Amino acid sequence: MPKILCLHGYGTSASILQHQLGPFMAAADPSYEFVFLEGEIECQKAQGLGPFVKGPFLCYNESFAPADIQESCDLIDEMIQAAGPFDGIIGFSQGGSVALSYLLQRQIDGHPPPFRWAVFFSTVIAFAPNDTFGSNILANLTDHEIRLLDGYPATDLSSLHPLTRALCETTAQTFYSAKTGGFISPNTPIAEFSKRDDPSQPRVFHPALLGDRIPIPTVHITGRKDNSLMVGLSVLVQGLCDQRLIRSLTHSGGHNVPRSADDVRAAWAAVDWAIQHSQKQHIW
């Protein structure tokens, strides 16, 4: 029986994701088992949820500091030990970010992935769970560079070194997009570049900053009506995956999972492709 681990978005819950994925799961092979990983931290209600949706509203991490990201990754390990093994992993929004962080850090550490394939719905950038990632860039930020970064998005960052832009501008853009779009709480701790290489400093996984790639088939699905900056981040993280093993598509909605019949059919066609290609691999 194929088993799939599912991670929800910020400000929702396992039960809410189960409802969101209703049409998608209804179209699945009846033998598939969907297992939902619940976040452990209460937070504000996610943007776009109807007034009658009841909490608790949960997330996987309160901040994007490496230690908090590691705790989120630990939840996946604990679920694998308790209910695994799993064939695939599905992540929506923040859940996709956590899944990406987990898979990429395992690849960096030289461990084989515990999943054969992955699906990312409207995911956002992945953050490093290791506080040594990007240290050489953060530790050497000049006062001038810090002033430019603190002024984002009003300042011109074109003068920054390409790798500094990859790490720091992407971090600044992520927080700006997420906060202005209402995708995370206004009280979420942001990157403070004046701290330079402080262990609490968030560090984004950017394709330009590392050579490791997620080695399993991945499917990336965004909404045509989603926030354009958030879609840009979803596209960026595709660069963290093996380009030979990617399928990407767009559904007709916004920051959500596919729900119309046509969108669900297209999503499953991509997932079936990923499953078929995963069976040809020998990395386990």
Swiss-Prot record:
The keyword Amino-acid biosynthesis does not apply. Disruption phenotype: Fully eliminates the production of asperlin. This is Esterase alnB. PANTHER family: ESTERASE ALNB, ESTERASE OVCA2. GO terms for cellular component: cytoplasm; nucleus. Its EC number is 3.1.2.-. GO terms for molecular function: hydrolase activity. It holds the Pfam family FSH1. Esterase; part of the gene cluster that mediates the biosynthesis of asperlin, a polyketide showing anti-inflammatory, antitumor and antibiotic activities. The first step of the asperlin biosynthesis is the production of the intermediate 2,4,6-octatrienoic acid by the highly redusing polyketide synthase alnA with cleavage of the PKS product by the esterase alnB. 2,4,6-octatrienoic acid is further converted to asperlin via several steps involving the remaining enzymes from the cluster. InterPro entries: AB_hydrolase_fold, FSH-like_dom, LovG. 2,4,6-octatrienoic acid is a particularly interesting compound because of its potential as a natural tanning agent for human skin. It is a promoter of melanogenesis and antioxidant defense in melanocytes in vitro and in vivo, topically and systemically. Pigmentation is a powerful protectant from UV damage and skin cancer, and octatrienoic acid is an attractive natural photoprotectant. It comes from the Eukaryota. Pathway: Polyketide biosynthesis. GO terms for biological process: secondary metabolic process. Induction: Expression is controlled by the asperlin biosynthesis cluster-specific transcription factor alnR. Keywords: Hydrolase. Belongs to the LovG family. It comes from Emericella nidulans (strain FGSC A4 / ATCC 38163 / CBS 112.46 / NRRL 194 / M139). The active site is at S93 (charge relay system), D226 (charge relay system), H255 (charge relay system).
